[in-house]
Amino acid sequence: MDKFYNYNSSSHQALLSFKVKPNSKQNLISNFVIINNIQYLKLSIKAIPEQGKANAEIINYLAKEWKLSRSNIEIIKGHTHSLKTILIKNINEDYLNLIINSYIK
């Protein structure tokens, strides 16, 4: 099974996989889901999936939740799909592990 994240220590970048549910009651990251033997973090977002509103809210929410600059968060795959790959730039591996461990129950 592929895990939901991959860290590159030479570039200090991480790729994370999310299963996004737009038009939710609240913005929330909650545990994992497995689809086609790939692990995804579940992410609920209040914004509707129209004209990039949900994607913008994903970036804003992750930046606020993880105390990162919005410019260091980029959706690189899945702009119009619920399965998204998000690039996190300029992140320390220890800090990434701290973030990840907060969602492992």
Swiss-Prot record:
Protein name per its UniProtKB record: UPF0235 protein RrIowa_1526
Organism: Rickettsia rickettsii (strain Iowa)
Family per record: Belongs to the UPF0235 family.
Cellular component terms (Gene Ontology): cytoplasm
SMART domains linked to this entry: DUF167 (SM01152)
